[in-house]
């Protein structure tokens, strides 16, 4: 634990804030959160640099942002003791620990009361009643309850507002990508074992220069420690708060990009609660060709992915209800060996289609795969023909309904077989769909593959599939398709 000095002045009913750091860490002359000003004063000049909030109309950030700004995020997530001076000249020691949810002031409630009073008066003047303004919780602490109990949720709300809502971040993607919070959470040491340190790029007050500084081992530990709180978008590199990410269907709040979903999340999204009945869960691969690998044996790799994902194979199959309509569904999981199709994956899908044929159920296949599994050689390639054969009987002979959903990525043997055999083929927005990957084509043919030529939007205009459907309305779209083809809910109380 380290001590840091904070000088705060409470005057005219408003909280003002200034941070002084040791010379080794640099100093900030303007209130933290102001990213448009500049200056280079030291602690001794604090009386000159502290201003009233009423004089800061030119600043772009909300007033409350001066208490904790993006540049001070390291202080928020550290286990530190702060020293604070109020307007009366009294000093207090504050212990702040996010992980343990502790916010303590040393045996004196006067400063805490004054601080709460300042926030309370400010929130009423700026936001009005909390019930009338949805931004209330983004910036303000809840003074009705214990600070110690709610400090964690307050920090959650603050970080979410800084990352997702503040206009000065969302309005400039260049500055956003280089912002302190972005690099703090996602920077990794390339040669950590050799150097023991990593570089962190910070954005300075003038928005024009980047300061390169070395983080110590403690900073790197914090980086890994809090990275689990965020999900980075593959498209815009924006940060999405993980606590709300699943409820958003893994769709980026910044740009609307559809990120990868696990098979379990997709089942939860598509199947009515309490109706899922999995099939062939105990079926596992056994290394049929004794694949030789100098790095990691095939069996060990399977065990590793089984522990990591909680799955036995790269596909989950079963039956359930979709808005009350009984369906057979198979969902591939890219997190398990890239969703590769081996003999077990092929067998589980084959059995699913045979079961649906006997029960006259519609079939949904959600594809997310890198293709055939190389560790099983020609046995994995045989699965293409086996699934296609049983699918032919299901569709052509039994006249039943098969819907294929292509997600990112869908490539290789899956694309060349059951992925493209659906009566209706649906793709997710921005999905990567191909037989051979871009790098393979370029290295094989020595030709450049145009950017975006394997994206769902481009392929849709070439007639490769029927429609592109976002995740939000997907369940209702499938329900309409099934009813159009004569599959109806089991009872009248089911959702249409």
Curated annotation (Swiss-Prot):
SUPFAM superfamilies: ClpP/crotonase (SSF52096). One of its GO terms (cellular component) is acetyl-CoA carboxylase complex. The gene is accD. The keyword Chloroplast applies. Keywords: ATP-binding, Chloroplast, Fatty acid biosynthesis, Fatty acid metabolism, Lipid biosynthesis, Lipid metabolism, Metal-binding, Nucleotide-binding, Plastid, Transferase, Zinc, Zinc-finger. PANTHER family: ACETYL-COENZYME A CARBOXYLASE CARBOXYL TRANSFERASE SUBUNIT BETA, CHLOROPLASTIC (PTHR42995:SF5). It is found in: Plastid, Chloroplast stroma. It comes from Piper cenocladum. Pathway: Lipid metabolism; malonyl-CoA biosynthesis; malonyl-CoA from acetyl-CoA: step 1/1. This is Acetyl-coenzyme A carboxylase carboxyl transferase subunit beta, chloroplastic. Its cofactor is Zn(2+). Residues 229-496 form the CoA carboxyltransferase N-terminal domain. Gene3D superfamilies: 2-enoyl-CoA Hydratase, Chain A, domain 1.
């Amino acid at each position: 634990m380290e001590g840091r000095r904070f000088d705060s002045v409470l005057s005219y009913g408003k909280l003002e804030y200034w941070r002084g750091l040791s010379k080794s860490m640099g100093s900030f002359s303007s209130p933290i959160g102001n990213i448009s000003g500049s200056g280079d004063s030291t602690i001794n000049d604090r009386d000159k640099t502290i201003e009233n909030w009423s004089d800061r109309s030119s600043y772009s950030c909300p007033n409350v942002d001066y208490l904790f700004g993006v540049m001070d995020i390291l202080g928020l997530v550290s286990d530190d003791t702060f020293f604070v001076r109020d307007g009366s000249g009294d000093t207090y020691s504050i212990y702040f620990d996010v992980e343990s949810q502790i916010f303590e002031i040393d045996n004196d409630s006067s400063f805490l009361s004054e601080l709460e009073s300042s926030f309370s008066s400010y929130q009423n003047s700026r936001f009005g009643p909390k019930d009338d303004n949805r931004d209330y919780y983004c910036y303000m602490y809840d003074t009705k309850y214990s600070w110690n109990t709610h400090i964690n949720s307050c920090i959650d709300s603050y970080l979410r507002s800084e990352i997702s809502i503040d206009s000065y971040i969302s309005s400039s993607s260049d500055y956003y990508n280089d912002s302190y919070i972005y690099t703090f959470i996602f920077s990794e040491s390339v040669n950590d074992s050799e150097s023991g340190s990593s570089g962190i790029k910070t954005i300075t007050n003038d928005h024009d220069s980047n300061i390169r500084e070395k983080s110590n081992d403690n900073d790197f530990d914090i980086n890994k420690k809090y990275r689990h709180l965020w999900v980075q978008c593959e498209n815009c590199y924006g940060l999405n708060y993980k606590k709300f990410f699943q409820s958003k269907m893994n769709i980026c709040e910044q740009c609307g990009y559809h990120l990868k979903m696990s098979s379990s999340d997709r089942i939860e999204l598509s199947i009515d609660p309490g109706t899922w009945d999995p099939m062939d869960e105990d079926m596992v691969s056994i290394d049929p060709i004794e694949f030789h690998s100098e790095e990691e044996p095939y069996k060990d790799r399977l065990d590793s992915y089984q522990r990591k994902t909680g799955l036995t194979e790269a596909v989950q199959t079963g039956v359930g209800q979709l808005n009350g309509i009984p369906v057979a569904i198979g969902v591939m999981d890219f997190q398990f060996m890239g969703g590769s199709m081996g003999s077990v994956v092929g067998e589980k899908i084959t059995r699913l289609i045979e079961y649906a044929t006997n029960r006259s159920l519609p079939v949904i296949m959600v594809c997310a795969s890198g293709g055939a599994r190389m560790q099983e050689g020609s046995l994995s390639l045989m699965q293409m023909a086996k699934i296609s054969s049983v699918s032919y009987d299901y569709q052509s002979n039994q006249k039943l309904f098969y819907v294929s959903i292509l997600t990112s990525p869908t490539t290789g043997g899956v694309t060349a077989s059951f992925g493209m055999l659906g009566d209706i083929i649906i793709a997710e927005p921005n999905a990567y769909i191909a037989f051979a990957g871009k790098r393979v084509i370029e290295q094989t043919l020595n030709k450049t593959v145009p950017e975006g030529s394997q994206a769902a939007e481009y392929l849709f205009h070439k007639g490769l599939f029927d429609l592109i459907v976002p995740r939000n309305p997907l369940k209702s779209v499938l329900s309409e398709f099934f009813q159009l083809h004569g599959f109806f809910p089991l009872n009248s109380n089911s959702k249409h």
